[in-house]
Amino acid sequence: MSKKEKFIAETTPRYTTKGHFFTLGKGILDGEVIPEVDVNIPLRTINRHGLIAGATGTGKTKTLQAFVEQLSHHGISSLVMDIKGDLSGIAATGEMNSRIQERYDKTKLPYQPQAFPVELMSLSAEKGVKLRATVTEFGPVLLSKILGLNDTQTSIMSIVFKYCDDKGLPLIDLEDLKKVLQYVTDNERGKKELADGYGSIAPASLGAILRSIVALEQQGATQIFGEPSFDVLDLLKTRNEKGVVNILRVVDIQNKPALFSTFILSLFAEIYLTLPEAGDLDKPKLAVFIDEAHLIFKDAPKVLLEQIETMVKLIRSKGVGIYFITQVPGDIPESVLSQLGQKIQHALRGFTAKDKKEISKAVENYPSSEFYKASELIQSLGIGEAFVTALDEKGIPTPLVHTYLISPESRMDILSPEEIDNLVNQSELVRKYNQTIDKESAYEILLRRMNEEEGNSTNTETCKPQQSKPAKEEPSMFESILGSPMVKTFGKTLMREGAKAIMGMIGLKKTSKGSKK
């Protein structure tokens, strides 16, 4: 038996599945594309998470695009973090060209240019569906971790949240929380209420928390707090039997790692709380793709990394897969990397001693192969080629295969401004979430109370300046526009006691919210 025959005989059975799958590409041996070797990815194991890695310019983004398209073909929705701003073309039909024709002549696979259903989303002023969350939804523990508070300050934050809950002071955005902290620090009535009901708290501690909030605001955090909240079930949509590709445009968030980590962790928590337990399904409900994943872990405190690791473990049982896209596997903490079942490794470049160490570490993450010398081949993989290893339907790692990857069927370029406008204007979710809702919250209530105490009804503060609460001008995330925050929270509590208990143990338990007046 020749080497080629042996390669076909040993590899093909391991990538043959009984259930639903998609073909990611064809095997390559000694530089030759082998059409007989299909590299198939079982849909059943998509929720086992994954990694797409490789040096700049090796084709990671196109692989991500093709992967998402294949999921869409099978009615699976996805949420894609688009940090470089080059994935909007998924909404437009691709075009055949000579390079694509050559690729598909070699693979013997059909190629059908087509567009896919897309929703554009944003955390900022970018056009698209606005994603927001209320401060109450984050809760005191998660918010404290984001702010980098110590244990004592975290306890104080929990007391402040309890005070707001008891006094009917809804915390919608950071201006609400800042106003409460100022009230219980500087106002005699506020100080007395806090001391009588919850114990005396040093003004210096409250001031330290306030300064941490201001620091977070400087990273742009005001834009992710507010109303109306986004319902994560709106991510699980299909159109014409294709899964919707939800593209979150976060081009302007690259230099704000704390804000990025905050959003990712809160998103995972909300998905976990909202979706029912599902186990291993024939195909997942949702796949989340995090481009430039190193930004999540960059300078993140240890406790925040632990929370992300925990959520990656837990969310799989909800039928959700998480995929990290980055340059080298070493960008991902070992505790997270060990949980990633699907691995797609594009070329790495060994220009420096550090690069060579990263290559050595990367190769150690993959199964050994008698057909490839991975440490050498990984540096010479062509564009549109990658090492692939996945999990079969039994959860067993498949052999490492040098893979000639499929091309995206949608446009491999961005949408024009006019095309983006048309896409946004046609979106039902934009109409649902982009209306301004400015309900009465802690800021207004306390401001009115202080004005009444002063006996000055003409005080200029009675009308809150628009610029003082910019988040009120933007929609919010993770909380249905229907009903008050209190109703939603208790509803989730009744429906998901098990989820609530688990989230409480890891510090992400939802807190009850005061009703709006």
Model regions: which residues?
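P-loop NTPase motor domains
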Residues: V68-S77, G85-T310, V336, Q379-L381, ...
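Conserved P-loop NTPase motor module
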Residues: M1-R14, K130-T136, I344, L377-G483
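Conserved ATP-driven motor cores of ASCE-family P-loop NTPases powering translocation/secretion/packaging/pilus
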Residues: S2, A66-V68, A91-L109, T310-I396
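Flexible glycine-/small-residue-rich
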Residues: K26, L43-T45, G54, S122-A125, ...
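Structural recognition of the conserved hydrophobic beta-strand(s) that form the central parallel beta-sheet
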Residues: I52, S78-M81, S122, L248, ...
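Basic- and hydrophobic-enriched, low-structure N-terminal and domain-boundary segments
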Residues: M1-A55, K62-H74, S78-L109, P113, ...
